[in-house]
Amino acid sequence: MPKQLSFSNDSREALENGVNTVANAVKVTIGPKAKNVVIERKFGSPDIVRDGSTVAKEINLDNPISNLGAKLIEQVASKTKESAGDGTTTATILTQIMVQEGLKNIAAGASPIELKKGMEKGLDIVLEKLKSKSIKINGSDIQKVATVSAGGDEEIGSIISKAMDIVTSDGVITVEESQSLETELDITEGMSFDRGYSSPYFVTDQERQICELENPKILITDQKISTLTNLVPILEEIQKSSSPFLVLAEDIEGEALTTLVLNKNSGVLNVSAVRAPSFGERRKAALEDIAILTGARLISEDQSMKLEEVTINDLGKAKKITISKDKTTIVAFDDTKDLVKARVEKLKREVEITESEYDKDKINERIAKLAGGVALIKVGAATETEMKYKKLRIEDSLNATKAAIEEGVVSGGGQTLIEISEELSNLGKEKSVDLNTGIKIITKALLEPTKQIARNAGFNGDVVIADIKRLNKGFNANNGQYENLNQSGILDPTKVIRLALQDSVSIAAMILTTEVAVADIPEPEAPAPGGPGADPMGGMGGMGGMGGMGMPGMGGMGMPGMGGMGMPGMGGMGMPGMGGMGMPGMM
């Protein structure tokens, strides 16, 4: 494909255009008086969102170089979302102002490299001061943080606070859609562990990059699975039951993993695979815990149990399993509650007789995972569009609350950044003029989130900043008053602010030091068949013959050469996944 090249100031200006386009669309979503963004969908109703990352992902520009800038700032939002779960709009706003100020100075003759060094030096100072201002969160602050992160929605703040109080920091909180109009909180058995899907091809929700299995059957084993032979009998039973299926094993690889992926993508099986958590003996113990939670039988080598002998009665079950790239959450049925309690009591007795402090800590971690349970926030709304909107707000708020528990909180509304900006401007100057300019770029950027919060609330951002400095109070955009924001309960998670700063400086510095941009030249759209003025329905001809019924996956299950589940190219030609379990091209 031919490439379009752009050099020097031209490349940076085009990148800036892309940055500005995305940032201008995103920054209306910050603060308690934020505005919504409506996103068209090819199928179904439009989405109404107030989330920076979601908006940024949807934007594609005609100019290839500008589109690179759009994708770079989308990366800022996505990375901040992935790491902190919130703060995407703040990161986007910071990136935009840094790029704008940096390019102004480069056009005036400043060295991009020296500016980058100055920005990085300024960032280091800001992060030190941010850490010193952070305070640990207490119980009453959880609801305040959740409410602020939900755009001032007190109902959401209250629900998240109750959920955190019930399951504690060791429990799991999940968000799902409800059939009712009300948003409800439900506590059930369950747990999570730090392992994700074995292949991204198992993803069922592309936008959120997760795999969700409703009422799945679960195979749990401490064995490695690499060949298809071991799985064939149980896969045949699963296909007959039409149940979703999760394989939780020490490892799953090679032919076995490939076969599961292909049958998943061809629609033959709704399946996923996850590696077992922990290591060594602790891995087996963790699998035993999960087996008890789900009512499964642990298929263990120690008991001379073979995978090919597994029946559907040996499998566990769950209400729902959600798998991301690095985490698995199991929502269990209540019928295993007594077994879980007995398991917890057994583990507590183990703690009492264990001498090693390290071993005690590990057993206590297992107790916390089993006993913590899962809090289900069931989101209700009058319409599907409202439900999706509300669900996104709750997820953002939940992520912000978790971040606050991890690293503490600071004064919200951008107030802490304004204080640090003042302190930064009073520091001694560096020898290099451009290095100083880089620090000044950071100093100015720290004011921008508050300015935008004020603009979204209908106030002049510059006037608000001046009043904040004069009165030495924060700006409450909810009521337009200047207050002590800590006392007003307006708090921001330190982790969210830290990651927004780090990610924005990283991308802004890369854009400022770019000298050449290379992008694909879009190919012209192909003309309509028959040329201009031709009948669009003409020339369709007859349909080709269907040939034989040698469609892939039509046969039974087995290894290559056995008829059904085999490697590609083993049988007749046809569409994948039309029949039984199989790989493409199997008979």
UniProtKB/Swiss-Prot annotation:
Q: Could you give a GO molecular-function term held by this entry? A: ATP binding
Q: Where does ATP bind?
A: 29-32, 86-90, 413, 492
Q: Which GO terms describe its biological process?
A: protein refolding
Highest taxon above the source species: Bacteria
Q: Which GO terms describe its cellular component?
A: cytoplasm
Q: Which PANTHER family match?
A: 60 KDA HEAT SHOCK PROTEIN, MITOCHONDRIAL
Its localization reads:
Cytoplasm
> Which keywords accompany this UniProt record?
ATP-binding, Chaperone, Cytoplasm, Isomerase, Nucleotide-binding
For this chain, the family text in UniProt reads: Belongs to the chaperonin (HSP60) family.
Question: Which SUPFAM superfamilies does this one have?
Answer: GroEL apical domain-like, GroEL equatorial domain-like, GroEL-intermediate domain like
| NCBIfam families listed in its UniProt record | GroEL, PRK00013.1, PRK12849.1, PRK12850.1, PRK12851.1
Q: What class of enzyme is it?
A: isomerase
CDD domains the record matches: GroEL
**Could you tell me what this protein is called?**
Chaperonin GroEL 1
Name the Enzyme Commission number(s) assigned to this protein: 5.6.1.7
So what does this thing catalyse? ATP + H2O + a folded polypeptide = ADP + phosphate + an unfolded polypeptide
- Subunit structure comment from the entry: Forms a cylinder of 14 subunits composed of two heptameric rings stacked back-to-back. Interacts with the co-chaperonin GroES.
Q: Which InterPro entries match?
A: Chaperonin_Cpn60_CS, Cpn60/GroEL, Cpn60/GroEL/TCP-1, GroEL-like_apical_dom_sf, GROEL-like_equatorial_sf, TCP-1-like_intermed_sf
State its role: Together with its co-chaperonin GroES, plays an essential role in assisting protein folding. The GroEL-GroES system forms a nano-cage that allows encapsulation of the non-native substrate proteins and provides a physical environment optimized to promote and accelerate protein folding.
